[in-house]
């Protein structure tokens, strides 16, 4: 998608689809005059409410309207940045369905939009572009069309090849800044989605590492990949235990972005990289198991976030740590009741092999603290079904030992639309993960599953005072039936916004 900004008057822009955005307030004030000036009948406004993401397509009379087609795009009240992202996603989705390749958006009123949302012009534009990337995303690389008896070009969805934002001359610079940031964040989020959408037979631990290496080459940050022998030498018993049933070796990948000049903060991001989770010996039910290819969503989002930070040039050192393996049953697989020794030296009784994510995260969290001692440690993981029971599929669970850190993450979630809700992390829950034969069990008693998993993880941060765990099991993947099913890339925007705040 070629995205550009222009100050050319709207009436002189040549495009297949002219988009006129309206907030609910603007709709009431001057919508009739705007539409009539552009050559369209204002009668359509009777049914248009300007709700965020609402679209009405107009067809102009030949020689009267400035474009053959126009779209009224609702921005809601315009008081939330997320409304602009939502509207853009709806626009992109509609344009692709209509096979429109050229779109122009009249952003002449962007300064007013920013004022209403108590934000900046750049932030509004960035959110809008992110929404365009979200709505235009398709994962169809594995489709061959071989079974179609007749290939009909009209059936093929066309991508938007050109998107133009029209702005007033005084706002051009800010719009361009927002556009550039939105392209980076949006493309990095879609990169993460591509990784998650790959099936388990096409994405193993080594492929995740290769994706990280390629990202580092593109964006100039260091990537170090530890193979199985090195993982064994480190004594990462959690990662090795999960990998025991697999025919494919594990990897532990470290991405290290070091900005030039003064570093404002050093942040470690840990992403769970289970490429396919069968549950191991504690085998999952077959229904929905195919979606367990998404159990490496945390890893994908960490790669996307590190790349985005590098491309944005933020003055934050960001270290991404990704323990990766699949979790499979076999004659050599770890069994319920086994006791393992983690990288930290803490012993764990494996009460359930389907509670594998916390085992590989345990090693990575300890490694982050011991090797880098960063200012902040944040891990992202599709960790528990219990978090879905508590919060559903649109909100992630947030657990943290630091109130200020939790507040910052919550605020970033509100801005980006990747919302989190803080959950308890009290020591009373430790009783539920006690073991009679080891230091701790990876399986809690019935109830509070997302909380006991978080209490388990906290034992492996080696006393670090600023740590947060984000359970993205719910919002990381959309089941079939959604407007765009599959991976969402949840966490990329959230982390980037958080790191911008700390810059």
From Swiss-Prot:
Alphabetical UniProt keywords: Aminopeptidase, Cytoplasm, Hydrolase, Manganese, Metal-binding, Protease
EC assignment: 3.4.11.1, 3.4.11.10
Organism: Chlorobium limicola (strain DSM 245 / NBRC 103803 / 6330)
Molecular function, one GO term: manganese ion binding
Cofactor or coenzyme needed: Mn(2+)
GO cellular component, one term: cytoplasm
Enzyme class: hydrolase
Species lineage: Bacteria, Pseudomonadati, Chlorobiota, Chlorobiia, Chlorobiales
Disulfide bond entries: none
HAMAP family in alphabetical order: Cytosol_peptidase_M17
Record-stated family: Belongs to the peptidase M17 family.
GO biological process assignments: proteolysis
Domain of life: Bacteria
Gene3D superfamilies: Leucine Aminopeptidase, subunit E, domain 1, Zn peptidases
Co-factor remark: Binds 2 manganese ions per subunit.
Residues at which Mn(2+) 1 binds: 277, 354, 356
Binding site for Mn(2+) 2: 272, 277, 295, 356
Pfam families in alphabetical order: Peptidase_M17, Peptidase_M17_N
Name of the molecule in the record: Probable cytosol aminopeptidase
Subcellular location per the Swiss-Prot or TrEMBL entry: Cytoplasm
Active site: 284, 358
Cited InterPro entries: Leucine_aapep/pepB, Macro_dom-like, Peptidase_M17_C, Peptidase_M17_leu_NH2_pept, Peptidase_M17_N
Function comment: Presumably involved in the processing and regular turnover of intracellular proteins. Catalyzes the removal of unsubstituted N-terminal amino acids from various peptides.
């Amino acid at each position: 998608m070629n995205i550009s900004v222009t100050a050319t008057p709207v009436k002189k822009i040549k495009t297949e689809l002219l988009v006129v955005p309206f907030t609910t307030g603007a709709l009431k004030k001057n919508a009739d005059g705007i539409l009539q000036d552009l050559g369209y009948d204002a009668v359509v406004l009777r049914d248009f409410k300007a709700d965020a993401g609402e679209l009405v397509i107009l067809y102009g009379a030949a020689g009267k309207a400035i474009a053959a087609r126009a779209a009224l795009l609702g921005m809601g009240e315009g008081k939330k940045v997320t409304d602009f992202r939502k509207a853009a996603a709806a626009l992109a989705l509609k344009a692709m369905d209509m096979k429109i390749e050229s779109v122009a958006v009249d952003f002449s009123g962007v300064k007013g939009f920013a004022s209403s949302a108590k934000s900046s012009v750049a932030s509004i534009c960035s959110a809008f572009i992110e929404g365009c990337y979200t709505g235009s995303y398709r994962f169809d690389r594995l489709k061959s069309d071989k079974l179609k008896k007749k290939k009909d070009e009209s059936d093929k969805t066309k991508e938007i090849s050109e998107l133009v934002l029209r702005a007033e001359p005084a706002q051009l610079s800010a719009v361009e800044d927002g556009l550039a940031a939105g392209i980076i964040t949006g493309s990095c989020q879609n990169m993460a989605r591509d990784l998650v959408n790959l099936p388990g037979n096409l994405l193993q631990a080594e492929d995740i590492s290769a994706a990280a290496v390629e990202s580092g080459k593109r964006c100039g940050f260091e990537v170090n990949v530890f193979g199985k022998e090195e993982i064994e030498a480190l004594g990462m018993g959690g990662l090795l235990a999960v990998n025991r049933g697999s025919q494919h070796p594990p990897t532990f990948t470290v991405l290290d972005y070091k900005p030039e000049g003064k570093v404002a903060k050093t942040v470690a991001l840990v992403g769970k990289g289970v490429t396919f989770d069968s549950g191991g010996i504690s085998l999952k039910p077959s229904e929905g198991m195919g979606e367990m290819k998404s159990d490496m969503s945390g890893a994908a989002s960490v790669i996307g976030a590190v790349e985005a930070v590098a491309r944005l040039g933020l003055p934050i050192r960001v270290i991404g740590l990704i323990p990766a393996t699949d979790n499979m049953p076999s004659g050599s697989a770890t069994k319920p009741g086994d006791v393992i020794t983690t990288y930290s030296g803490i012993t764990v009784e494996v009460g359930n092999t389907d509670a594998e994510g916390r085992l590989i995260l345990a090693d990575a969290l300890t490694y982050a603290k011991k090797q880098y001692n960063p200012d902040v440690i944040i891990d992202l993981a599709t960790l528990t079904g219990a978090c879905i029971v508590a919060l559903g599929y649109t909100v992630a669970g947030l657990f943290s030992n630091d109130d200020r850190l939790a507040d910052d993450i919550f605020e970033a979630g509100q801005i980006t639309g990747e919302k989190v809700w803080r959950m308890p992390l009290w020591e009373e829950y430790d009783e539920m993960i006690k073991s009679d034969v080891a230091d701790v069990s990876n399986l809690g008693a019935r109830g509070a599953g997302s909380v006991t998993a978080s209490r388990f993880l906290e034992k492996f941060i080696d006393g670090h005072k600023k740590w947060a765990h984000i359970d993205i099991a719910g919002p990381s993947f959309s089941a079939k039936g959604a407007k765009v099913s599959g991976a969402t890339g949840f966490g990329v925007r959230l982390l980037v916004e958080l790191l911008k705040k700390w810059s």
